[in-house]
């Protein structure tokens, strides 16, 4: 039964994460007629609550990974299980940055589901205070200006790219197709949210890991260490 209450990330655990990953993969495989997703079989009070989530697809090749799609929802328009299914299908087939996923790629795709809290606008008298208020490793950001400009970056992104708070703000502005210093404009709305990440350890595997954004390692540091 659908519940109007919004799921809280504190309610989530590894088993819920495993179910979300399973739903996401079945949703993608269904498009290739390799599986059938029946959401009614996922009768769980947490999954039946309305939720916000993003699904990220990574393609593994030669021991390296690259982004293959990422789509999500920041409005509580459906139960969490439906959001996971819809976001997975959109990430696989409707991300405008990539060609639609092909069936022969599935064996090399790792699925990641990030469940979000409801975004809250950050209001400050002095816009220069924004870098002092946001927290890299904890906050995700949304930048909005009018109805034409909107950009979102998940909490794990600044950790992966070793950004400080000001760079994080600038990159979110760029994601919204605005100037990097748009966050200083009082007509621009800045929102933040938190998230918890569930990720497959290998493609189509039953093992998953639960990740806090603050635990994400900087990719640049990894590259330097591997030199």
Curated annotation (Swiss-Prot):
User: Where does this protein have coiled-coil stretches?
Assistant: none
Q: Which Pfam families match?
A: AMMECR1
Gene3D superfamilies cross-referenced by the UniProt entry = Hypothetical protein ph0010, domain 1, Hypothetical protein ph0010, domain 2
For this protein, the record's InterPro entries field holds: AMMECR1, AMMECR1_dom_sf, AMMECR1_domain, AMMECR1_N, AmmeMemoSam_A, Uncharacterised_MJ0810
List, for all copies, the residue spans of the domain called AMMECR1: 15-209
Question: What NCBIfam families does this protein map onto?
Answer: AmmeMemoSam_A, TIGR00296 family protein
User: What name does this protein carry?
Assistant: Protein SSO0193
């Amino acid at each position: 039964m659908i519940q109007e209450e919004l799921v809280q990330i504190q309610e989530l655990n590894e088993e819920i994460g495993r179910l979300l990953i399973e739903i996401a993969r079945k949703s993608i495989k269904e498009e290739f007629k390799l599986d059938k997703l029946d959401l009614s079989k996922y009768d769980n009070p947490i999954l039946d609550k309305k939720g916000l989530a993003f699904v990220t697809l990574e393609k593994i090749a030669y021991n390296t990974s690259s982004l293959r799609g990422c789509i999500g929802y920041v409005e509580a328009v459906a139960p969490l299980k439906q959001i996971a299914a819809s976001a997975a299908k959109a990430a696989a087939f409707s991300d405008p940055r990539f060609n639609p996923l092909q069936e022969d790629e599935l064996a090399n795709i790792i699925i990641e589901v990030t469940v979000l809290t409801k975004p809250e606008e950050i209001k400050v008298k002095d816009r220069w205070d924004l870098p002092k208020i946001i927290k890299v490793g904890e906050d995700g950001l949304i930048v909005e200006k009018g109805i034409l400009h909107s950009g979102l970056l998940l909490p794990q992104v600044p950790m992966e790219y070793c950004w400080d708070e000001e760079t994080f703000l600038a990159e979110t502005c760029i994601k919204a197709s605005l100037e990097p210093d748009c966050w200083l404009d009082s007509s621009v709305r800045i929102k933040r949210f938190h998230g918890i990440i569930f990720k497959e350890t290998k493609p189509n595997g039953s093992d998953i890991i639960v990740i806090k954004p603050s635990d994400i390692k900087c990719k640049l540091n990894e590259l330097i260490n591997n030199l």
